[in-house]
Amino acid sequence: FLGGVTRRFPRMRFAFLEGGVAWGCSVFADLIAHWEKRNGNVIQQLNPANLDRTKLGELIKQYGGEKMYSRWPEFEAQMISGMGSALPDELDDFAACKIEKKEDLRDLFVPNFYFGCESDDPTLNYAFASKVNPFGAKLGALLSSDISHFDVPDMTEVLEEAWELVEEKGMSEEDFHAFTFGNAVKLWASLNPDFFKGTVVESQVRKLQAETAQSEEAR
């Protein structure tokens, strides 16, 4: 996917603004489902070159009758010219990503993509739906306040509105922390650990970075 960009640049991060995260959850699930049906090995089941045309003609004659079989030469000619005339050099849609197992898709997608979500968007809960998302993944939803737009009549109520998702049991307090803080740190401080230096959240960022490093060492 995307020309294998996250395989070639594993530390590169991408953030999508004002699109929510529901579509990201769908893309993530679809990537895995498509890989299962169209990976480099399975795709051969769909390769026109592997079609037994003689057997297909026999089956059409046997079950379709003479009327249908009389059109078989025409159909076969169209099939030959249409199905095998423009095959790509590489049949594996995921070749650029060098996917060997489903888990590779998770590792090349989840840490690399982040999704700006407005505080009044209930579908951002999908990002944290570990019982639904493949591999129990939680995607990188980010708080996008949308301040100054019509849907934010009072800028002091943005976080309060986001907290309603916790009150309504859509997300946990841990997920809320990731949504409003943790995922932003992952995005902007992953390549520049000092990104938040000199800001009011510097000490909290340092604390989270230390906890993350300790957790990774323990694995």
Please tell me what each predicted stretch does:
Residues 1-53:
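Divalent metal-binding pocket/active-site signature
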Residues 3-4, 12, 22-23, 65-106, ...:
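Mid-to-C-terminal alpha-helical segments outside catalytic/metal-binding sites
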Residues 30, 37, 41-42, 52-74, ...:
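C-terminal structured domain segments across diverse proteins
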